[in-house]
A protein has these predicted regions:
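N-terminal secretory signal peptides
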Residues: 1-7
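Conserved PLP-enzyme active-site core in the AAT-like
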Residues: 12-15, 21, 36-52, 56-61, ...
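Bacterial Sec-dependent signal peptides at the C-terminal "C-region" and cleavage site
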Residues: 26-35
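Generic N-terminal amphipathic, Lys/Arg-enriched alpha-helix
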Residues: 50-60, 71-77, 339-343
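Short glycine-rich or small-residue beta-strand-to-loop segments that form or flank ligand, phosphate
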Residues: 60, 73-78, 102-108, 145, ...
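Conserved N-terminal alpha-helix of the aminotransferase class I/II PLP-enzyme fold
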Residues: 67-109, 120
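Conserved PLP-dependent catalytic core of the aminotransferase class-I/II
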Residues: 298-331
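Conserved C-terminal alpha-helix-loop-beta "cap" of PLP-dependent enzymes
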Residues: 320-413
């Protein structure tokens, strides 16, 4: 059963509805040389609705907010030109030292890393192949082995290189899947299900001389995941920059073996005739990613979890007294977004509003609040949810926003219980 694909489809449908209702500001802006100390508020100028993010690190909601130190690093980098290749090399070497891996590359997000890492596996022994993928593949190995339960929407980034997936479900099938066309074995770290675990996946692939790629995009915290998988033997691992690490949204990390990271860089910008030319990473994103790694490594898993639980408990405390309402705090039992979430349940015969309707009410209100899209879903995102569960993602809330979320939830639910 491919639970994740259905979950992702539900999320993508939610994203499409969100975008459809957003509208776009039209018209050219007049030039204005005036500068305010913090810059002009272009959200206000463009008529874009600001939101309170009680959902999580979703791309459609602009992911995370960069900490002050990261914002400052990005702003400072924007003021001075440098040689891009020198910056990428220096940043990669620095990040690799900090994350205990052979090499690293700052990419244009985790999806970009999937494409570049795959291209690296396809072209490392044949540099002319850089110019041939994804169409001229007669002499290029292009089969990627994956567990059937690990197929997901984001593997399109791998198919961008002209690959063909070979799906397996058992160890016997996995052993038999390798041939002269096999170029990579792919593992989706947050997949629900799959008969073959990480260590066995790596062991078998390496026995056949094939590199392993682990997509762990949303899988920090815990902090140690940033080196756990490379130390486990995965040749390539990717993390999103704009999720738990709190870097720029359009940045990511590709970590792994020196040979493969070097090959990934050859398939990347600023080289023109490559599959990664459009995946440009600017100096601001590179510096921001380095600064985010520095910031993230000053945190602790225990400290972050305690803060997130505190926010959830504060919201739950302000919902007491609503008939039949019960609140619990839960962590997903999958690797992605493994942080405390607040789950709210009630008797729909007593509180006469559906979780989806609550989500819409908070979205339409002022300030506009986005709840986690697994609200009203069965086992959403690895959480113990059902059709009658409101899910509040507390980890992207900013100071004081938990009280606003609690107030709006209480207003909507109390009115429905009247």
């Amino acid at each position: 059963m491919r639970v994740f694909r259905s979950t992702r489809r539900a999320f993508l449908n939610w994203t499409n509805r969100l975008l459809a209702g957003s509208g776009l500001a039209a018209g050219a802006l007049a030039a204005d040389s005036r500068q305010e100390p913090e810059g002009e508020d272009y959200y206000e100028k463009l008529g874009v609705t600001k939101i309170i993010n009680a959902a999580g690190t979703y791309t459609a909601l602009t992911a995370s907010i960069m900490p002050a130190s990261v914002q400052a690093a990005v702003a400072r980098a924007a003021k001075t030109p440098v040689r891009l290749a020198e910056l990428q090399t220096a940043a990669g070497e620095y990040i690799a030292r900090r994350l205990h891996c052979e090499a690293a590359l700052v990419t244009d997000g985790a999806a970009s890393a999937l494409t570049l890492g795959t291209a690296a596996c396809m072209t490392r022994a044949n540099r002319t192949a850089i110019h041939n993928i994804p169409t001229d593949l007669a002499e290029i190995r292009n089969e990627v082995i994956v567990q059937k339960s690990h197929r997901y929407d984001y593997d399109h980034a791998i198919r961008n290189c002209g690959t063909r997936f070979v799906e397996v479900e058992t160890m016997k099938q996995y052993e038999a899947a390798f041939n002269e066309r096999t170029v990579m074995a792919h593992f989706f770290n947050a997949a629900e299900g799959g008969a073959i675990g990480r260590e066995e996946w790596v062991r078998v692939a390496h026995a056949h001389g094939v590199p392993c790629f682990n997509d762990a995009a949303a899988d920090v915290p815990p902090i140690a995941n940033l080196w756990n998988y490379t130390e486990m033997g995965f040749d390539l691992v990717t993390f999103s920059g704009g999720k738990g690490i709190r870097g720029p949204q359009n940045a990511g990390l590709l970590l792994g073996k020196k040979e493969l990271i070097a090959a990934a860089a050859m398939n990347n910008n600023p080289f023109s005739d490559t599959v990664g030319r459009g995946m440009k990473v600017a100096k601001e994103q590179i510096v921001g990613m380095v600064a985010a790694v520095d910031w993230f490594l000053t945190q602790s898993d225990a400290g972050m979890e305690a803060e997130f639980r505190k926010r959830a408990e504060r919201i739950a405390a302000q919902l007491k007294g609503i008939p039949t309402l019960k609140s619990t705090i839960a962590l997903p039992d999958v690797a992605a977004n493994a942080v405390p979430h607040l789950l709210i349940r009630y008797d729909p015969q007593r509180v006469k509003i559906t979780p989806e309707a609550v989500m819409q009410e908070l979205r339409r209100g002022s300030p506009s609040i986005e709840l986690n899209p697994t609200t009203g879903k069965v086992r959403g995102g690895g959480l113990p949810t059902d059709e009658n569960t409101i899910v509040v993602g507390v980890w992207m809330l900013q100071a004081g926003e938990e009280d606003i979320v609690a107030r709006r939830l209480r207003e909507v639910l109390s009115q429905a219980a009247a």
